[in-house]
């Protein structure tokens, strides 16, 4: 997020009509640097659009366990205008995104766009503690699920074309030869050892003491 603010500042200093977009999750609101960036973006009037994907979970922790208050209120506290949309109404989402981008371009000031959505699969492979009923309810609500259930020629055609493309990709991957490496090796050959030095048996001592002795011996050998 701070890097995005820096890019937005660079765009402002060059009098560009472009804007910088940074995408974060609801779990990112636990990071203090987010609020420092919102403050700077508001104070310096940076062309920054912060898009927050609110999928209710920070990895596997529901935001009700960690998030206090309202999400948009956090940006509004810095005087940043906020917009709310969701992925279940795509036409409305597209319209709000376009309006928000135009608002940032026109004013040069930051905006905060919250998009409510849901992650249908686990964050990782084995950390899904959500109830099966909750996940199932969102699968049933998902746009692709609803589209696939439509008894229409268009849905059937899209389904058939998708399956054909996946099958063709699998065949192509299986038939593809192993790619040749671009370079023989990514590691340089090691330098030959000039000589071996037999050392005295080690002592049981603290690492910091050994470091001090090594530094002292080197300083005694080298007057610099």
Predicted segments with their positions:
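Glycine-rich ThDP/TPP pyrophosphate-binding loop and its adjacent helix/strand module
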Residues: 1-175
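Thiamine diphosphate
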Residues: 1-21, 184-224
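Alpha-helix initiation/capping motif
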Residues: 131, 142, 180, 184-185, ...
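Terminal amphipathic helices with adjacent charged low-complexity linkers/tails
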Residues: 164-196
């Amino acid at each position: 997020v701070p890097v995005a603010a820096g890019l937005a500042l660079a765009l402002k200093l060059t009098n560009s009509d472009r804007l910088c977009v940074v995408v974060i999750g609801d779990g990112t609101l636990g990071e203090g640097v987010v609020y420092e960036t919102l403050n700077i973006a508001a104070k310096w009037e940076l062309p920054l659009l912060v898009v927050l994907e609110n999928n209710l979970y920070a990895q596997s922790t529901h935001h009700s366990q960690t998030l206090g208050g309202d999400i948009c209120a956090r940006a509004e506290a810095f005087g940043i205008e906020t917009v709310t949309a969701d992925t279940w109404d795509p036409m409305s989402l597209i319209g709000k995104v376009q309006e928000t981008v135009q608002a940032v371009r026109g004013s040069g000031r930051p905006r905060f766009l919250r998009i409510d959505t849901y992650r249908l699969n686990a964050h990782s492979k084995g950390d899904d503690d959500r109830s099966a009923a909750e996940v199932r309810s969102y699968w049933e609500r998902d746009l692709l699920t609803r589209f696939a259930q439509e008894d229409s020629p268009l849905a059937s055609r899209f389904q058939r074309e998708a399956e054909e493309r996946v099958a063709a990709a699998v065949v192509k991957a299986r038939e593809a030869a192993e790619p040749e490496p671009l370079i023989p090796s990514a590691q340089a050959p090691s330098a030959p050892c000039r000589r071996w030095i037999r050392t005295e048996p080690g002592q049981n001592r603290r690492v910091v003491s050994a470091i001090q002795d090594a530094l002292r011996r080197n300083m005694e050998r080298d007057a610099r």
